[in-house]
Amino acid sequence: MMAKKPPKPAPRRIFQERLKITALPLYFEGFLLVKRSDHQEYKHYWTELRGTTLFFYTDKKSTIYVGKLDIIDLVCLTGQHSTEKNCAKFTLVLPKEEVHVKTENTESGEEWRGFILTVTELTVPQHVSLLPGQVIRLHEVLEREKKRRIETDQLPLMPPEKEKEPVQDYADVLNPLPECFYAVSRKEATAMLEKNPSWGNMILRPGSDSKNYSITIRQEIEMPRIKHFKVTRTGNNYTIELEKPVTLPNLFSVIDYFVKETRGNLRPFIHSADDNFGQDPNIEDRSEKFKKNPHNA
């Protein structure tokens, strides 16, 4: 059964972790029963609306989401008649699927509808039954979302060019590249880590396919070992190809994942501008071109 009392906000530590992982502002949260197109039954999630994405957690205390739903292309939100007492039902109609949602009570159902329509339509809906204070919150969220989209250059997005150089696959205007990114080969990355271990032991570099990324690390457990991990771009996210793949929202989160999972044993490889690599002097120039202007690098 769903909770009858309004849930309390997540503790500050959990909030900060989720903010860091999702890299999106929190607009609304609460319990939802969700049925995706590939599910037969509803699943119970603690749900957060961040930006124009719904993040699903197994419970209030989880910091890692188990699923997410991008609703920026929402076609419409349709209400459903519910035979269950104190329960609101509606459907999120998206271009490629329909997602059925149930809320814990009719009031929270109106709030969810209000916030979802506000961030997707960029206007406060007039046909929701909310209290004055709740409507004020919608206007505040509307201004925050407009500002966020302007800052991330998402309003509007220009269609991609038909022809482009392979190097443009590294363009990440919305998420600048981490400091430990270097436009080097696997061999060069290995040499950098071996020659300058005091600067760090983890490098982010272009993948061998010129479309994705790779991470090269140097670990010293008994004896130095070099390992390479492929990081594949999947839509707006990045997937680390491990035994159990891990998907994260940006490259900064990818680096943070390795640092946290090794309890700080892996550190980003960062050098001073005054230091000398002792290798190809063009490496630094190439990396800066990728970071500042990847289209022309």
UniProtKB/Swiss-Prot annotation:
One Pfam entry for this protein is PH
Q: Which InterPro entries match?
A: PH-like_dom_sf (IPR011993), PH_domain (IPR001849), SH2 (IPR000980), SH2_dom_sf (IPR036860), STAP1/STAP2 (IPR039111), STAP1_SH2 (IPR035877)
Stored SMART domains: PH, SH2
Tissue localization of expression is: Expression restricted to the bone marrow.
Q: Which positions carry Phosphotyrosine?
A: Y170
Modification after translation is described as: Phosphorylated on tyrosine by TEC. Phosphorylated on tyrosine by KIT.
Cellular localization per UniProt: Nucleus; Cytoplasm; Mitochondrion
Question: Cellular component terms, GO, for this chain's entry?
Answer: cytosol; mitochondrion; nuclear body; protein-containing complex
TM region positions: none
| SH2 domain residues | 179-273
User: Which biological process annotations from GO are given for this protein?
Assistant: cell surface receptor protein tyrosine kinase signaling pathway; cellular response to lipopolysaccharide; myeloid cell differentiation; negative regulation of macrophage chemotaxis; negative regulation of macrophage colony-stimulating factor signaling pathway; negative regulation of microglial cell migration; negative regulation of ruffle assembly; positive regulation of B cell receptor signaling pathway
Nuclease: present as a keyword of the record? no
Assembly mode: Interacts with URI1; the interaction is phosphorylation-dependent occurs in a growth-dependent manner. Interacts with KIT and CSF1R.
Protein function: May function as an adapter molecule downstream of KIT in the proliferation or differentiation of hematopoietic stem cells.
Give the protein's recorded name: Signal-transducing adaptor protein 1
Q: Which organism is it from?
A: Mus musculus (Mouse)
